[in-house]
A protein has these predicted regions:
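Ligand/cofactor-recognition surfaces for anionic moieties
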Residues: 2-882
Length: 882
């Protein structure tokens, strides 16, 4: 089986983006040659793959011979000799003498690509771990391969020197690997790999607006000019299949209870049969049908859970560069953005649309969402203007959502004319509602005009290629109440790093800490003595420090701000009497980018740990002090005993588990833990600066009772990216290897900052699985996006598998549902065969691997047989294409 190389999926379509960019370049007068590029995204991607690609399993001698670019060995050696000596030696050590062995023919390095006049389209070279899997265990700072260096040197070198002579390069797809090559975090030297590879070639980088951290990485380490782009279309998940049938049956149950009690036992049995058919008894922790006395409580719980799943915001497709949403997509995106209170001028300026509607009817949206199964008598003013069941808080949410949609559809129909707001509100609700009108007025004057300017994405990409100034703008998640990050098409900036955490983030962080401790107390009856928290730079920038605030709150500290600058100047310890609980020991696994971007925050957290450890408090009031004392008794080194912040080797990035999972060479938790420790066993803090500290990391991790990762946006979820399973799942696997027992794994949800929740990792996985992964709405949306949509399906399966391998969160029934939805559904199967047969093979291969490894413990024999048949058919199809 092949070793697939996956990058994190972009939330845009690079193939279609390239088609649009080609058309815009041609219109602007660029020479695209005599043969025009394909005008279809799938056709372009298929042509690029046919030209060679990087999958050695399917690469043929004919493709190598016909490669667009051929770099003679002597030419490459001349370029290689210009690389600083230290990097040259490291490349020789790992990749041999130039030109190496990767993608070579007859001593030449070959590059797969498509050339259209003065424009060339290439696939970024592979990072190299798939080709050198032993490096996964030992070399997180693996240098680029000869092939990698050659590709960028060929782009840069003039034709007289054997190169293409590019004046600029555009990276399409978020994100690439160039900016993550080893070297300094900023202020790069000549021997830092990104600088050695890219040189002074201008880089223009369309990048999603909600990812300030990774975009900033490209700015800092690859001198990129970012042109930000919009988030994907969003929609409410709704119910489907057995979930929709259950909703109807619950309504029928309420009716027969009131009007025909004799039928109650029959309907109860039908409800339970459907619950079992949908595998919902796992979600609801009910293995047997509740008895008659408890069934009504079970129904309330079920109703509330269905409401929670259907109310999730999911992606309803992928963003297409410069495609301004209109019609139904704009209605859905406006509803998603208006769900959160709006932050304007650094303060909360307007309530969310649903929040304003709820208040107008004497309800509280947060209370409804907190107890969706609660029986309620809804106000007649609400039930008179919108039809639907009206017996529970979940019903109230549905009615309010329906009203919100009618309001937004009404405005969409009238072209968002500002002077129609009051009339639309009165027509839909039957009476004036000033607060609701204010939200719609804001949408008409600020949100929609900014969405209309999404076309700036292409205009400013071309402007950057013309050497023109790309206007700056803020970054963040629009659906978190940040309309000011729109319009897109700007060169985004992030945050003042010394203002982390902000006052608003402190409030959210305290809520996250309180929610986590309350959930653990409810689950176990006690407080956790030690918590492990994963902290990323992107999240810190997007939220202005929610995670940092949570760490401080768990320790029993709080920030001190300068009122004028809003910067954090230090921390203070909260007295135990005010805290009202023990101080929790916190171990933090930071990302490499966080290390680079927030060194002063690392110092702030380190100061907090050391101050709390030095407090004269009883062990049962200060778990951190107790643990530090135990370590001091063992080795006597205070600096080692108080090390609680661990991350990547200086100059390196990542957690290492993605290449390990993709290489398929791991066998047990010991392998997962080994890579996690090799890639993350470096201590940070005052006087540490990335000191190798594996033993101290393992000692700290062995105490972790709770492993936490927070999720601050619904624009993506925990199986949308490999980083979640690498960092969070990796932490779980590490603790399990060290102790023999998995820690409690939780996900903090602050996507709505005013309504923070904590779920177990299993609960969050099932919620995402039902709301998005096997939701026909999402699958159909991906089918609209061809090759890239199919890639998203395959990536989702990969990331679920990765989380299962590390944290054990995928049940057998979930694998069965994946196979049924992605491979056995005729429409989706045909889509994969036509648009991306490589994704079809990859999905099948991954599911078979899950069964082979016992992660999918007891697959149905018929399912396995169909998977094997699918795999063989897919192999044959791909062989026919070669």
């Amino acid at each position: 089986r092949s070793r697939r190389r996956r990058r994190r999926p972009a939330r845009a379509r690079p193939g279609v983006a390239a088609v649009r960019l080609f058309a815009a370049l041609a219109e602007a007068g660029y020479d695209l040659g005599d043969t025009p590029p394909p005008d279809d995204g799938d056709a372009l991607i298929h042509a690029l793959i046919a030209a060679g690609g990087h999958d050695v399993e399917w690469l043929t001698p004919e493709q190598l011979a016909a490669a667009e670019a051929r770099i003679p060995g002597a030419t490459y050696r001349r370029w290689f000799d210009q690389v600083p000596a230290e990097l040259r030696e490291r490349m020789r050590e790992h990749w041999g003498e130039p030109p190496g062995e990767l993608y070579t023919e007859g001593g030449d390095i070959v590059l797969a690509g498509l050339r259209f006049g003065n424009v060339v389209l290439l696939i970024q070279p592979p990072r190299g771990f798939g080709e050198n899997p032993i490096a996964i265990y030992h070399d997180p700072d693996l240098p680029p391969s000869h092939h990698y260096l050659a590709a960028y040197r060929w782009l840069t070198a003039p034709a007289a020197d054997g190169g293409f002579g590019a004046d600029a390069v555009v990276h399409l797809g978020k994100h690439g690997t160039l900016e993550w090559l080893p070297g300094k975090g900023l202020g790069l030297a000549a021997d830092c790999a990104p600088d050695a590879v890219l040189g002074d070639l201008p880089l223009v980088y369309p990048f999603i607006v909600n990812d300030p951290g990774e975009g900033t990485q490209a700015k800092r380490r690859a001198h990129a000019v970012v042109v930000d782009h919009l988030v994907p279309p969003m929609a409410r998940a709704e119910t489907y299949g057995d979930l929709a049938k259950l909703e109807q049956l619950l309504d029928e149950y309420a009716t027969v209870q009131a009007l025909d009690p004799a039928k109650v036992p029959t309907v109860r049995a039908q409800i339970w049969d459907l619950v079992r058919a949908a595998e919902l008894h796992h979600d609801l922790h009910a293995e047997a049908m509740p008895d008659a006395d408890d069934f009504d409580d079970f129904v309330l719980h079920l109703d509330g859970y269905l409401c929670e799943v259907k109310d999730v915001q999911i992606r309803d497709g992928l963003h297409i560069l410069a495609d301004a949403p209109t019609g139904e997509p704009r209605v859905n995106l406006v509803l998603a953005v208006l769900r959160a209170p709006q932050i304007w001028g650094g303060a909360r300026a307007l309530p969310g649309l649903r929040q304003a509607l709820a208040v107008a009817y004497g309800l509280d949206e947060q209370e409804l969402l907190a107890a969706p199964g609660q029986r309620l008598t809804l106000p007649a003013a609400l039930t008179d203007v919108v039809d639907g069941p009206a017996g529970t808080a979940a019903d109230a949410i549905d009615l309010i959502e329906a009203l919100a949609r009618r309001l937004v559809v009404g405005m969409e129909t009238l072209g968002w004319a500002v002077d129609t707001v009051d009339a639309v509100v009165t027509e839909v609700t039957g009476r004036p509602m000033p607060d609701v009108a204010a939200v719609l007025h804001f949408a008409a004057t600020e949100l929609v005009p900014r969405l209309d300017r999404t076309t700036d994405e292409l205009t400013n990409t071309l402007g950057a290629l013309d050497g023109r100034f790309v206007p700056p703008g803020p970054s963040g998640s629009p659906t978190r109440g940040l309309v000011n990050v729109l319009p897109t098409g700007r060169n985004f900036y992030s945050v003042d790093p010394k203002a982390i955490p902000s006052r608003n983030a402190w409030d959210v962080g305290v809520a996250l800490a309180d929610s986590l401790l309350a959930r653990h107390l409810a689950d176990t009856g006690g407080y956790p003595r030690s918590v492990g928290l994963t902290v990323w730079g992107t999240s810190a920038m997007r939220t202005q420090g929610d995670d940092i605030a949570e760490v401080l709150a768990l320790l029993g500290c709080r920030p001190v701000w300068d009122d004028r600058s809003r910067r954090v100047t230090g921390i203070e310890v909260v007295p135990t009497a005010e805290l009202g609980r023990p101080r929790v020991d916190v171990t933090v696994r930071i990302s490499g980018f966080f290390r680079d971007a927030f060194p002063h925050v690392v110092a702030l957290l380190d100061d907090a740990v050391r101050r709390v450890a030095a407090l004269d408090e009883p062990d049962e009031e200060n778990y951190l002090r107790a643990h530090v004392a135990a370590d001091l008794a063992e080795h006597g080194d205070e600096r080692r005993a108080t090390a609680r912040i661990f991350g990547s080797k200086p100059g390196a990035y990542g957690a290492g588990l993605l290449p390990l999972i993709d290489a398929r060479t791991w066998r047990s938790d010991a392998d997962l833990a080994e890579v996690y420790a090799v890639w993350g066993g470096y201590a940070y803090g005052r006087g540490l600066d990335g000191r190798e500290a594996r033993a101290d990391m393992e000692r700290s991790f062995a105490r972790i009772a709770v492993a936490v990762k927070n999720q601050d946006t619904r624009e993506h979820d925990i199986v949308d990216s490999d980083d979640y399973f690498q960092y969070h799942g990796g932490m779980v696997a590490m603790v399990r290897h060290l102790t023999g027992t998995s820690p409690q794994a939780y996900v903090g949800d602050s996507a709505m900052p005013h309504d923070v929740r904590t779920r177990t990792l299993g609960e969050e996985t099932r919620r995402v699985f039902r709301a998005r992964v096997v939701n026909p709405k999402w699958i159909a949306a991906m089918r609209r996006h061809g090759y890239k949509g199919a890639f998203e399906l395959a990536a989702t399966v990969d990331y679920l598998f990765g989380y299962d391998a590390t944290a054990g969160v995928v049940d057998d029934w979930m694998y069965e549902h994946l196979a049924a939805a992605y491979l056995f559904d005729e429409t989706t199967r045909e889509f994969l065969e036509q648009s991306n047969p490589w994704a079809l093979r990859g999905i099948t291969e991954r599911l078979l691997e899950a069964a082979d490894r016992g992660l999918w413990a007891k697959p149905e024999p018929a399912t396995l047989d169909r998977l094997r048949d699918t795999y063989l058919a897919s192999e044959g199809d791909l062989e026919d294409r070669v």
